[in-house]
């Protein structure tokens, strides 16, 4: 027997029919729409972050030497670029697998594999973002203890573009975090049915 609190929690996440009663098809449609929207946003954020990072260059002359900083000079930035490309490709592929889930007879194992995919993409994104954030912090503030000087006061445009690319990657991460929450909710609701 379901408790009143349990029933109200289920209703909170379900859409209601015109008569006020929740329907499975409306709830299913809203979940699929949320999945597609979040995946589309993740694609948009990652595909935008890639060219922003690739085009980040600012030639500067230091002590008579011409230097052009680029993402290629930082393994963390190359890693983030690779992560963004990977997440973009796998998210585009995952859109093909979300569409069949709209049927009410979908097997729970399909949701599990999609959730597993979402977890791997989330972990990739947060690791790439963390690496880029560490390098960005050192570029902005330096580390006096090890005599690393900040460079962002010299190459402001380059640092600004790297920041934009990293922020876009973080936005893709938050999309995947929301996808994970949706997946867990779906798996939990199926387990209690």
UniProtKB/Swiss-Prot annotation:
Residues 57-78, 140-161 are extracellular. Keywords: Cell membrane, Membrane, Transmembrane, Transmembrane helix. Residues 1-25 are annotated as: Disordered. Coiled coil: none annotated. GO terms for cellular component: plasma membrane. It comes from the Eukaryota. It is found in: Cell membrane. Pfam families: CASP_dom (PF04535). InterPro entries: CASP/CASPL, CASP_dom. This is CASP-like protein 1F3. The chain crosses the membrane at residues 36-56, 79-99, 119-139, 162-182. Belongs to the Casparian strip membrane proteins (CASP) family. It is a multi-pass membrane protein. Residues 1-35, 100-118, 183-193 are cytoplasmic. Its main location: membrane. Homodimer and heterodimers.
